[in-house]
Amino acid sequence: MAKVPVRKPKKKQNPLKAAKIEAVDYKDTALLRKFISDRGKIRARRVTGVSVQEQRQIAKAIKNAREMALLPYSSSAR
């Protein structure tokens, strides 16, 4: 029996580096919405393709934007 070749998953491109964004700002809601699911949850690193440090910045910016009422805490899924 021959072994089935295992494919390595393709590395996701970093969306922040592609858009040439150095700092994540809580006032940039258009950018932050890309990292929020349709249910209003913050998307995981493995889904978005950002680094650990950038994921922390994004999470902090989303939480600040929610506090300032720029983003909803949850979406109207129902």
From Swiss-Prot:
Gene Ontology process terms (BP): translation
GO molecular function, one term: structural constituent of ribosome
Assembly and binders: Part of the 30S ribosomal subunit. Forms a tight heterodimer with protein bS6.
Similarity-based family: Belongs to the bacterial ribosomal protein bS18 family.
Cellular component aspect of the GO annotation: cytosolic small ribosomal subunit
This protein's name: Small ribosomal subunit protein bS18
Function: Binds as a heterodimer with protein bS6 to the central domain of the 16S rRNA, where it helps stabilize the platform of the 30S subunit.
Gene: rpsR
A Pfam family of this chain: Ribosomal_S18
Keywords, sorted A to Z: Ribonucleoprotein, Ribosomal protein, RNA-binding, rRNA-binding
NCBIfam families assigned: S18
